[in-house]
């Protein structure tokens, strides 16, 4: 662990912002002196949060960027409303309000994993003048399974936890997330289960899932509008991703005008953790590249 990692803790970076009368968001902030802001958006698995997804990435990115790692609505220490529009719209608009509340103007880069990748794309589509470059890891809503069965193994296990929220079902879900099974420790399982099994978290997760079949569900089908993205987009996929399999990248790669794709072998759905050093270099180089 580096000196920087030791200095940046959950407590030292933890902040709250009241972005609407009935919505308070929790986020982690680091690299405050840097000019360029990057927003990190976590995935949607049970017990997920910005810290659980990005704790080790935050110090590295904070060396170059002003980092805002946001607990999306319904997750972490953020409020957990159960009445909201399609979830990507819900999260993207909440992020816009957070940036306004914090006085962060101009464009921000967005780095999103899974559900967070979908929210990042929705933000870029709905607020194009506020979005810089996008780094998307196995993004939800953008991937279309051309060959893999649907629902995928990961989505099936996510639903199983929703119906029967036990520690055993959570462990089964988490093990699908990664290629390297050593990453799924008892400590991680216990931590995620404690966060996921509260009544508020379970209700929020149910509302999030329901929003993908509500009247405005088509707003979650991001691949339909992918051609509208004018930002540079880096798609990152794990070859062994069992949540949003690799073949799901092909439609996005074809439709997004300025997209590029990087595939990690020996990697599941959590590229930012399984390929930590390579991921950080790849994302940083992409975001700092001076090309248009």
Swiss-Prot record:
InterPro entries: AB_hydrolase_1, AB_hydrolase_fold, AB_hydrolase_sf, Epox_hydrolase-like, HsaD. GO terms for molecular function: 4,5-9,10-diseco-3-hydroxy-5,9,17-trioxoandrosta-1(10),2-diene-4-oate hydrolase activity. It comes from the Bacteria. GO terms for cellular component: membrane. Its EC number is 3.7.1.17. GO terms for biological process: lipid catabolic process; steroid biosynthetic process. Substrate binds at residues 44-45, 53, 113, 192, 270. It is an enzyme of class 3 (hydrolase). It holds the Pfam family Abhydrolase_1. Homodimer. Catalyzes the hydrolysis of a carbon-carbon bond in 4,5: 9,10-diseco-3-hydroxy-5,9,17-trioxoandrosta-1(10),2-diene-4-oate (4,9-DSHA) to yield 9,17-dioxo-1,2,3,4,10,19-hexanorandrostan-5-oate (DOHNAA) and 2-hydroxy-hexa-2,4-dienoate (HHD). Also involved in biphenyl and polychlorinated biphenyls (PCBs) degradation. This is 4,5:9,10-diseco-3-hydroxy-5,9,17-trioxoandrosta-1(10),2-diene-4-oate hydrolase. The gene is hsaD.
């Amino acid at each position: 662990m580096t000196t920087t990692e030791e200095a940046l803790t959950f407590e030292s970076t933890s902040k709250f912002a009241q972005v609407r009368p009935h919505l308070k968001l929790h986020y982690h902030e680091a690299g405050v002196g840097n000019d360029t802001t990057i927003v990190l958006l976590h995935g949607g698995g049970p017990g997920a949060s910005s810290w659980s997804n990005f704790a080790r990435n935050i110090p590295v990115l904070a060396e170059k960027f002003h980092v805002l790692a946001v607990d999306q609505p319904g997750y972490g220490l953020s409020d957990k409303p159960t009445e909201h529009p399609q979830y990507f719209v819900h999260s993207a608009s909440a992020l816009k309000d957070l940036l306004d509340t914090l006085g962060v103007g101009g464009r921000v880069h967005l780095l999103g994993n899974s559900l967070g990748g979908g929210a990042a794309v929705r933000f870029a589509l709905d607020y194009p003048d506020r979005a810089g470059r996008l780094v998307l890891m196995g993004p939800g809503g953008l991937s279309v399974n051309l060959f893999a069965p649907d629902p995928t193994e990961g989505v099936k296990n996510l639903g199983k936890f929703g119906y029967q929220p036990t520690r055993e079902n959570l462990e089964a879900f988490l093990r699908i997330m990664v290629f390297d099974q050593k990453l799924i420790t008892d400590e991680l399982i216990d931590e995620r289960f404690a966060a996921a099994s509260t009544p508020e978290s379970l209700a929020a997760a149910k509302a999030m899932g329901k929003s993908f079949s509500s009247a405005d569900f088509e707003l979650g089908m991001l691949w339909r509008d992918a051609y509208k993205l004018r930002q540079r987009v880096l798609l990152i996929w794990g070859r062994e991703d069992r949540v949003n399999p690799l073949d799901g990248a092909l439609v996005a790669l074809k439709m997004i005008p300025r997209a590029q794709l990087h595939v990690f072998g020996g990697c599941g759905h959590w590229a930012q953790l399984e390929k930590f050093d390579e991921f950080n270099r790849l994302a940083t180089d992409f975001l700092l590249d001076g090309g248009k």
